[in-house]
């Protein structure tokens, strides 16, 4: 089921997911998220309250953060969209600037429905 989450929520969930993949146990610190997203720790704390209340994370204030199954699914979905968009821009439209590709895909990924992602996957697999 597709749910239109706020872009900021998705960015935080994606950041937590990517950071947690590099850590044993998957627990992430507020400061790591702040550094990853280049925001103030107080901004992270504010968002963590929202994510916790919406059931996306398990959070022990002043300790660490872990994604719930729900949070992990949203993060993985965003990353799949990003991956297919990059393939499309790189292989079909022949855009080569990785920095620009990252910037474009990070903006668009939040507006792609599951149906569009599936269509992109199909297009990418048939034309590449």
Residue ranges and their predicted role:
Residues 3-39:
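N-terminal helix-turn-helix DNA-binding core of bacterial DNA-binding proteins
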Residues 33, 44-54:
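Basic amphipathic alpha-helical segments that dock to polyanions
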């Amino acid at each position: 089921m597709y749910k239109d989450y706020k872009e900021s929520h998705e960015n935080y969930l994606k950041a937590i997911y990517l950071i947690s993949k590099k850590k044993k146990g998957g627990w992430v610190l507020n400061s790591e998220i702040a550094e990853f997203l280049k925001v103030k720790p107080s901004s992270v704390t504010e968002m963590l309250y929202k994510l916790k209340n919406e059931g996306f994370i398990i959070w022990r204030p002043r300790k660490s953060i872990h994604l719930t199954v729900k949070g992990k699914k949203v993060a993985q979905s965003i990353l799949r969209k990003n991956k297919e968009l990059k393939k499309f821009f790189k292989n079909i439209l022949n855009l080569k600037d990785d920095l620009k590709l990252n910037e474009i895909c990070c903006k668009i990924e939040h507006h792609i429905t599951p149906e569009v992602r599936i269509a992109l996957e199909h297009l990418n697999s048939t034309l590449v």
